[in-house]
């Protein structure tokens, strides 16, 4: 899974985390370009679209075209372990895994930035919006900074020292078209003073992440543009932020487009304490939630062989 934005880093900062993951298997054979999703299982499989609307199918279609591969059929199996429509980069993770699995089956060198670019375009074709931050984190792993907003993707990994994370996901019914809705509420114009403040917050976020400056990081996690517009759509937003801070979190943010939230701490022990406070926040708010302590995860991994 991945968590994007991290406060003031809207659409340009994301981190891969080990709380949840997807798995994709592909089998390539001679054929005429058919891509068939033969199996979907896992704890969140019931919310996965079927047919051509499935992100895995679309990602493989685009990958075959990008690699100029013809005369093959592809059978796909998806194990869906990331909650759907929860702000955890689930569709992007599936797309990245599918493309990487195809590359492995074809014994082609793994170009992680190219994978991210194709996966982002697959998301755009299915959901209307690419999320290059999420897919880049899923492909490269770690915490990533986007240096471009469209393909070819330019990105850098940033080493994250002494940080642990708490991922909290309220158990609510997935909202169809949620990401599009959450983008519509974002302001389209800004006063110059707000733009400058937003830029300063992004500077603080990057400085804090790069150098481990907790004070700067705390400031950078407090967005002044996107989060204020979205917060009213996030269950228990204010109480989760408040309780997490009481537990010792550096700060808490909406993960992607929500409804999940991400709290950042300075150690695993501190994360466990914050997780306890976040669980209490949802209880006091009257909402069931799954709360997990997470570490930074590596990028997509490929295994070649097996039964496909």
Place the predicted regions along the sequence by residue.
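ATP-binding N-lobe of GHMP and related small-molecule kinases
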Residues: 1-86, 104-110, 141, 297-308
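Short, conserved charged micro-motifs
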Residues: 32-36, 179, 269-275
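Beta-strand segments within the central parallel beta-sheet cores of soluble alpha/beta enzyme folds
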Residues: 37-39, 73-78, 110-122, 200, ...
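Short, well-ordered amphipathic alpha-helical segments that serve as non-catalytic structural scaffolds
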Residues: 54-64, 202, 240-243, 277-278
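DPxDG-like acidic metal-binding loop motif
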Residues: 88-112, 117, 139-141
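Alpha/beta catalytic cores of group-transfer enzymes, especially the acyltransferase/condensing modules
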Residues: 112-162, 252-254, 258
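Acyltransferase
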Residues: 160-242, 246-247
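Glycine-rich, charge-dense phosphate/pyrophosphate-binding loop(s)
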Residues: 209-308
